Amino acid sequence: MKMKRKLLSLVSVLTILLGAFWVTKIVKADQVTNYTNTASITKSDGTALSNDPSKAVNYWEPLSFSNSITFPDEVSIKAGDTLTIKLPEQLQFTTALTFDVMHTNGQLAGKATTDPNTGEVTVTFTDIFEKLPNDKAMTLNFNAQLNHNNISIPGVVNFNYNNVAYSSYVKDKDITPISPDVNKVGYQDKSNPGLIHWKVLINNKQGAIDNLTLTDVVGEDQEIVKDSLVAARLQYIAGDDVDSLDEAASRPYAEDFSKNVTYQTNDLGLTTGFTYTIPGSSNNAIFISYTTRLTSSQSAGKDVSNTIAISGNNINYSNQTGYARIESAYGRASSRVKRQAETTTVTETTTSSSSETTTSEATTETSSTTNNNSTTTETATSTTGASTTQTKTTASQTNVPTTTNITTTSKQVTKQKAKFVLPSTGEQAGLLLTTVGLVIVAVAGVYFYRTRR
């Protein structure tokens, strides 16, 4: 029993320590709020917004947003941190976009998303600003549209963005008479920017057409989503022409021929068109609705096209091309590494050398009959920081003392290169926890071993 209590106490203590360690190592993603944003909003052609009716914004016209954001050096931005910008209620995103925010060094700085439901654009950062924390800056460019549910038009619309007041005159929705033969429009999906919705109305005046043949061909970089196709002859109502695409979508069908069309494919096997012939005479308006999928990325503001053509025994060939604007956005970021102060080390080295040399010249004595050369040389050398050389001969001596002091001074300059230092972001938590766990197991093993003995 006593052993079990000891074991329970040990496990409890270790659990508390491990829990405290885990809590201290978890890093929480933060919302970045300390920044400066210099922003501007213009019309799609770059001209400034104005409450002058002659410079009005069209009902469906997109507005261009430019945001230039800077962060103080002391603000730490970690991987997973986010920054959110919200549109005023008078504006809205037309579709959900996800786009990259690229750093000037070629690395990904963050992912940005626009949400048409909340009117927010959110950037989720990578660790680039941990590696390069100084002079942090970012730009975000995107389009938005007037939120027709929250404004009264025609007239002046006022709103605030980034603490700046804007005022713009907005036109009413254009009322354009539908072509008596064919009308076609397209628009980008609100949730998926890779999808384009197309709507077609043919023969809205309900005239009698013999053997009506329709042929629809989508533009480049698109394929038809077959399951989305709705193609129908609308119910004929005498004296009640189909005045709009909305009315066409709501009028009862006389015949649904969606499953009877013949599809065309391109060389890649993608469905890019369809055709159908209504035999005999028909005075029904025709409504067609379907979705295309983009097969490649589109540049900002580029329009994709879609063309439908009709022919019949008693009508001239006619075609109509519809366009859908592709919304897009982009971002850029820049920063630099935090450099350490440059260190200069000066090292002065002094070397003193003193040498003393004594030289004795040899003398040769000569008699009249005998030449006798006698030379005695004695050399003594001692090294004690001074060097002395002495030469002695049997003749006259000349002592020449010489002392030389040599001083050498050298300067060494050392420049330390800037080091890239990554702050702890909690990524080491797994490794450290594993190590702590092994230590705990080892301690527990020793404890049980000694207890049993």
From Swiss-Prot:
Coiled coil: none annotated. Residues 331-403 are annotated as: Disordered. InterPro entries: Adhesion_dom_sf (IPR008966), Collagen-bd_dom (IPR008456), Fibrogen-bd_dom1 (IPR011252), LPXTG_anchor (IPR019931), SDR_Ig (IPR041171). Its main location: secreted. One of its GO terms (molecular function) is collagen binding. PROSITE patterns: GRAM_POS_ANCHORING. The keyword Secreted applies. Residues 426-453 form a propeptide. Residues 342-403 have a biased composition (Low complexity). It holds the Pfam family Collagen_bind. One of its GO terms (cellular component) is extracellular region. GO terms for biological process: cell adhesion. Residues 1-29 form the signal peptide. A motif (LPXTG sorting signal) lies at residues 422-426. Keywords: Cell wall, Peptidoglycan-anchor, Secreted, Signal. It is a peptidoglycan-anchor. It is found in: Secreted, Cell wall. The modification Pentaglycyl murein peptidoglycan amidated threonine is found at residue 425. NCBIfam families: LPXTG_anchor. This is Wall-associated protein.
